[in-house]
């Protein structure tokens, strides 16, 4: 009788174990309006307020990549905080936190030698993550800016994981795309700049592995900023 009771209890315990839920998945998925497209950008722990700084009326960013250069005309009049953040991280004049070490970084450009970690032909190319995985950032976040522009070919905008969670990740639109106004637009490649658009095409059409990561690294070597 005791043996039968023990076996019954043991069987119940085993069946109970099978009902234990699996570990929860961290909420890191960010949708770009299309359910087939998601990028990973966890919410940073530190909230950063971008202090507006005097900027030139015309600012261009030359993104030097392993595939060639793309010249982007920034919009300091329409998205001053976002442009100030991008320029500071590109030049190394803005402090950020290295997600690999947790250490504060000063005087070093964040974008140098960072890859475009997610590429979707006819949609966009995304980069700006120091980890190169889609889960990294500068260790802070800042608010969206409402910009009355469309996501046309060559447009550069901030990636985010929800409202007011901008950091360092950005994307460049490959083809005109009907996105809602949820991602701060802060610049664009000139439609007549065929050389820059050819580089965009080359990166956007590269072969990718599952998860939309290029098989061959598409590297941002550095970003030069010119203010006029």
What is the role of each PLM region?
Residues 1-24:
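Sec-dependent N-terminal signal peptides of Gram-positive bacterial secreted proteins and lipoproteins
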Residues 17-228:
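Cyclophilin-like peptidyl-prolyl cis-trans isomerases
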């Amino acid at each position: 009788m005791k043996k039968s009771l023990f076996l019954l209890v043991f069987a119940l315990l085993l069946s109970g174990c099978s009902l234990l839920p699996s570990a929860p998945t961290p909420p890191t998925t960010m949708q770009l309006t299309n359910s087939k497209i998601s990028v990973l950008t966890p919410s940073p722990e530190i909230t950063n307020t971008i202090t507006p700084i005097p900027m030139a009326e015309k600012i261009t960013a030359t993104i030097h990549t392993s595939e060639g250069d793309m010249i982007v005309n920034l919009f300091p009049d329409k998205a001053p905080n976002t442009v100030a953040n991008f320029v500071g991280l590109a030049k190394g004049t803005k402090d950020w936190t290295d997600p690999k070490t947790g250490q504060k970084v000063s005087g070093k450009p964040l974008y140098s030698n960072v890859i475009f970690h997610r590429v979707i032909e006819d949609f966009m190319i995304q980069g700006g993550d120091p980890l190169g995985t889609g889960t990294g950032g500068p260790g802070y976040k800042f608010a969206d800016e409402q910009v009355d522009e469309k996501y046309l070919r060559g447009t550069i905008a901030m990636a985010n994981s929800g409202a007011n969670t901008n950091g360092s990740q950005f994307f460049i639109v490959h083809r005109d795309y009907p996105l809602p106004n949820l991602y701060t637009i802060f610049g664009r490649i000139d439609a007549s700049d065929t050389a820059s658009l050819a580089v965009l095409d080359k990166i956007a059409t590269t072969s990718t592995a599952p998860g939309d990561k290029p098989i061959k690294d598409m590297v941002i070597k550095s970003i030069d900023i010119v203010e006029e």
